[in-house]
Curated annotation (Swiss-Prot):
Single-stranded DNA-binding protein required for DNA replication. Plays several crucial roles in viral infection. Participates in the opening of the viral DNA origin to initiate replication by interacting with the origin-binding protein. May disrupt loops, hairpins and other secondary structures present on ssDNA to reduce and eliminate pausing of viral DNA polymerase at specific sites during elongation. Promotes viral DNA recombination by performing strand-transfer, characterized by the ability to transfer a DNA strand from a linear duplex to a complementary single-stranded DNA circle. Can also catalyze the renaturation of complementary single strands. Residues 1139-1160 are annotated as: Required for nuclear localization. Gene3D superfamilies: Viral ssDNA binding protein, head domain. InterPro entries: DBP_sf, Viral_ssDBP_head, Viral_ssDNA-bd. It comes from Simian cytomegalovirus (strain Colburn). One of its GO terms (biological process) is DNA replication. One of its GO terms (cellular component) is host cell nucleus. This is Major DNA-binding protein. It comes from the Viruses. Keywords: DNA replication, DNA-binding, Host nucleus.
Amino acid sequence: MSNEELSALAPVGPAAYVYFTKTNHEMNEVLATLSLCDSSSPVVIAPLLMGLTVDQDFCTSVRTPVVCYDGGVLTKVTSFCPFALYFYNTQGIVDFSEPHGDVQRLCDETRQRYAIESYMPEEGRAPTDLAALCTAAGCDPQEVLVHVVVGNGMKEFMYAGQLIPCFEEAAPTRLNDCDAVRVPLYPPTLFGSLQADVDSDELSLDKRSSFVESRGLYVPAVSETLFYYVYTSWCQALRFSETKVLIEAALKQFVNDSQQSVKLAPHKKYFGYTSQKLSSLEKDHLMLSDAVICELGFSFASVFLDSAYGASDSMVYSEWPVVVNATDHRDLIRALTELKLHLSTHISALLFSCNSILYHNRLVYLTSNKNASGTGASQEVLLKSIHFANGLTGLCEDTYNDARKLIKCSGVVAKDERYAPYHLSLICGTCPQLFSAFIWYLNRVSVYNTGLTGSSTLSNHLIGCSSSLCGACGGTCCHTCYNTAFVRVQTRLPQMPRLPKKEPSVVVMQSRFLNDVDVLGTFGRRYSAESKEASLDAKADEGSASTSNRTASSSVDRTHRLNRILDYCKKMRLIDSVTGEDTMTINGRSDFINLVSSLNKFVDDEAMSFVSEVRMKSNRDEVLGATQAFNLDLNPFAVSFSPILAYEYYRVIFAIIQNVALITATSYIVDNPLTTSLVSRWVTQHFQSIHGAFSTTSSRKGFLFIRNVKSSKNADHDRLPDFKLYARGTYSVISMEIKLSRLSVPSLLMFRVKNRPISKASKGTTAHVFFRREHVPKKNPVKGCLGFLLYKYHDKLFPDCGFSCLQFWQKVCANALPKNVNIGDMGEFNNFVKFVISVTADYNEHDLIDVPPDCMLNYLENRFHNKFLCFYGFKDYIGTLHGLTTRLTYQNHAQFPYLLGESPNFASAADFALRLKDLKATGVTAPLASTVTRESLMRTIFEQRSLVTVSFSIEKYAGVNNNKEIYQFGQIGYFSGNGVERSLNTNSIGGQDYKFMRQRCILATKLSDVLIKRSRRDNVLFDEDIIKNRVMAALDSENLDVDPELMAMYEILSTREEIPERDDVLFFVDGCQAVADSLMEKFSRLQEMGVDDFSLVNLQQVLDSRPECGGGGGEVHDLSALFTAASGEAVGNSVGLNARGGEHAFDEDCGLLPAKRGRL
């Protein structure tokens, strides 16, 4: 896509549309399920989805006409906002929504409490007659839903009610199998006297011509929703309090390209400073940094959002597998609701984690003795001192103005000690629809009871609701109101931070495919030249020593070794060649010993060979520099399926831009001290230079990746309406020149999050205590590396023993196994137990990963890397990445009061228990809630395009070799708080041995086969592949009653009627010339004899010339002496020929090494 022409990605067209959709009951329910709505507002915030809210061929980015000049129009590139706003006849949608109490009143009180600006409709201006609007579009006002989609550059005009509908260009379309009409909206700048060089003061939210006054689409409810859902949130992210000033500035910024001018600083107030003990110099540095990154964030949000982005796979509603596979409407609603339940894990992380991106809107100066600035400060000191922190504290502090004078707080001064509904309303931008959506999730997440606050807390609350004194709903809907929701999750709510501190930020984004998340990540991995993201990374890391090993010319090839091991496992039928799932067959203890011993020997040999290769071609520093990395998508349409995630997307964008902007800001602040009385004056003096410096250095520094979409020509011709004539009442389409304001636009591509698995100890010191490995723990074999096999094949290994696997091994290890337990031959049993214990002990001796494997692929990778690291001299634990994927499980009815269906009216706990019993008796299904399970292979999360929640911080460091450039990288972090997800808690992971500090987790929901249709061929097996697998299995068969070559011939001929060609046979036997020659000789004999019956019995009769053995009881030569183990050898080497390789040894010289190495 990076080489795509701008004109193709963003065609000329309107950047706003109003849709009139003939709706029905089913459409309303689908919209209610996927949208944000509250009974206090007629506006429904819906997702931007092709086939549901916009056309199937909708263009997500356009070059839209903005200003007319003589003979043509000037166009600007913009992308659509990732949401749609329904505003007429929406009661049918809102009626499906769950009541949550008087949310509007709570939002109003929140604004008063924290001095947040409220929306005020224009005085004296009449709203647009929406019924007349429907009639003008040729629709019955009683039968249609009306909604609008708008581009980022047009949303301010939409807010101001200045977009002009052009009904002459109305076009029929279909949305979710409903008839619809689409009408374009044009900006007022096309119809007035504005020219490209007109003074920008003529452009305003309040100034408009009589034509715009009479024809503009003005819906106060839509303006109010934009005010809170978009702009109030933007103000919070920028630490700016004048919402209407920001809207006015955004309007002029798009039309007049004023990104390089100062717009917000003169109006900015600085909050959260008085509670910090800052010197005068530190306060100046913090205020300047605050003002500069606020301006850069606001300017570059316009640059990046008014750009070109293609549609994401997840926004094509009509192709969602959950939609396509639904059997009927009820099944569709069930599937969509379950999808939302999966998302509840991610929503929980955004709410319950103290370091959520939604809370990180405060800038703090954290000093230490090492970083103390004294009389001056370097850029390095400032970058180590200035951080984003949780902004829930200090909300009612006095603030500083532009003149650095203290201003008394105008809100209600209150000491917030506990997280309350006010705080949730605040982070929602006081948008009632968004707040209501969060409450829906809080009513459905799991309850985490504690010894102090057991399940009786919720039941006592519900019993008390009978008094109808609920402050949230007055007793009308206590089963779902926000007070009940907060009681349910009170043990999970985040703690209010007492002191500001540097913490990583928790975000929810969609993943990209490319990843390096195995044990050693980038080390020893070579990348194909075709990999676009790999080439991006190579460019990004120029001058950076920390990731220099992630290039296409890695000195060693670790992937080759892993592929050899995978090929061996496929050859031995231990794993499925397509899915990677375990497929081994174990019929007894000897099978188990042979399989494991042969596999261990092969893996250990590969690890030792890799050690030799690293010693010859690489060095220890390159191993220490191993980096695990994955990419997260910054395309706004990757999250357009959820308005909550679209809301959070803007917060992420502002946070990233401002955090990276700190580098540019601090470099100018250090060199140019504040000498004026006004902060805005200093910013005005330097902003143009700062803007230019940031635009050239913000990306390709290891963290943020941007692509430039270019146009080969700046002018074109097309047929458009004569806008000047249209303003006078006549519609006419003419050919005109179309100019593009910019030939190149930068668009956000992705950002990269990394982790260093190997802890670097300073010279002369030991590793950090979290990674230190001071002793080797002894483990019960069932809890060790072979545990997954011992569990799976317990019945095969010890048939009729009468004990479960865990109990059996506990008794064995305790020397307490009763004599009446059937264990078979005692000698064989002793050998098996010794073997299992020795393998477990050997694995533990080298286990630096400290994560028990749960499948064969897991075991292989862990053993290989453990052995390599130990053989190479590493002794301490390493850090690991873990993917926790969501799944739905049934829960207790009593913890989900929304199932009651009405406000509770219970006199006692017995009444409540009786009501629950009635619910179960009447067939009310147990509620589902989202939990997580650990993914065996982390990379599958990225290969199956998942929605991921991850915590990361943006770290900055200087380049090498006297390079003054400052580089960044996203460092994976932690989730702060015990209520995020129980699997993340210290006690769940391992608190006593610091395992929780070595493991970094991400939460994930796989979108493949849910929202994204698989478009790539995932190793589909052709018929020839299946035949080949059968032939190879026949050649490896241990069945002594059938000649393996005859069995192979039978498999080849089973699907054909003619003798195969030699090339086909060579393919079936995996390129082994000797076997192919032997088979072809037999095929020739069949052809000469004219045989046409290719059954196995007939092939044996025709070709098998072995002497008869006279049944199975004949005498045989005693060859046991050939296989007698030397006395004193380890148990693992005394169990038979396979312990030393034997017939399962995988020798490269045998000619059976698979020619193709496919990646699972």
